[in-house]
Amino acid sequence: MQVQRKTLTQLSIPICFETLFYMLSGMVDTLMLSSVSDQAVGAVGTANTYISVFIIMFGVISSGMVAVMTQNIGAGKPGIAYQARQLGLIFNAVIAVLMSVFLAVFSGNILKMVSIAPALFDSANTYLRIVGGACFLNALIPIFSSYLRVFGYTKQSLWASIIGNVINFILNAVFLFVMNWGVMGVATATVISRIINLIIVATMGAVLIKAKDSPERIAPGKILGQIIKIGFPSACETALYNIAMTLVVRFMNQMDVDGMNVTARSYALQIANFSYCIGAALAQANAILTGWHIGAKEYDECNKGTRKAAIYGVITASCLSITFALLGNYIARIFTNDVQMINLVTKLLAIDIVLELGRVTNLVYGQALKTSGDAVFPVVMGAVFMYLAAVGGTYFFGLHLGLLAVGAYIGLASDECIRAVGMVLRWKSGKWKNKGLVD
């Protein structure tokens, strides 16, 4: 069957906009909820934190699938790519249904176990029961979206995301301001919009991709083993990152009594995320190209493509982060009028220039290594330096030396840059060439 072979730019632009819309939907939800109450925002944020922990489990399959599917597509075996999708779909669906039932039934017990603030309990319980009870959608959407992307169909996934977000916005407005459903309304709107998103990506995949008709097949156990071989380390890295960031925030909460430092980090993060989404899109697009080239044994093209993606990423990250730093004094005023807070956010955005350069390099080379089959090395780097540099740096520079949020950002930037150097050196060693999944 015909694969939609595309360039780095053609693949990355739709992925970038899809990531951007995903980020904006979260911001819109927060802004609309804030009109109800600060407690509602806090409750939903808390519930989403715990839902995210469970969603990591679904990443084991979806991230491993991309490597297996792209390499087999590059090797001219789309039938095996279809087989990988089917196995991933079944595996994720079974786990997701069990997880959905667990969250729906035991939402209150989970929140009591983590000692949530009493003022947030009822709203968080409502949200966790509804959205958590439908978390199977979070397991299935990435499977179908990845399936479209690896065959070169990135616009369809983008349109599904846009339509889902528009529906979410409209339903939020109706449920919040017309029907006065509060948190229950936001949760219901979230679930309905995700159902629409799932229907679109599943339908587009069935209509556009005919890999099912290709005759290539191998033992299902072998495919599942390959998926887990790549996906499990990737999911571990995500889990380690989330735990590390939890510790960083915990240290930052100890820096003052009014929460200024951790709040400044939140504002700086919201601004810097626009730079991050471009780097993430380039990394995902290059991962697809890398898989295609490795499947076809085109190793020189892998090197050229990954270097090109990293250069594009560094240039865009530099331009955006420098712009944000220079205009930080004005951008921060969107969130707050507190002069001290604005000055602190501006300082963090200046350090963020270095952080973003490390992060985009880390993303591009790290994703390329995972797609090539060399998935363990990024986890080892993360396990060591996320905790030594990011967590340890936050404690040492932020608390011990008294640099507070500025010190925390020095630690975070150090982590990204050290890991970036490690990823580049690992890629240049060429060891990933022997980790391919296709015979």
Residue ranges and their predicted role:
Residues 1-15, 69-136, 178-232, 290-355, ...:
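Short alpha-helical transmembrane segments in multi-pass integral membrane proteins
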Residues 10-29, 130, 164, 193-197, ...:
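Transmembrane helical elements of multi-pass membrane transporters/channels
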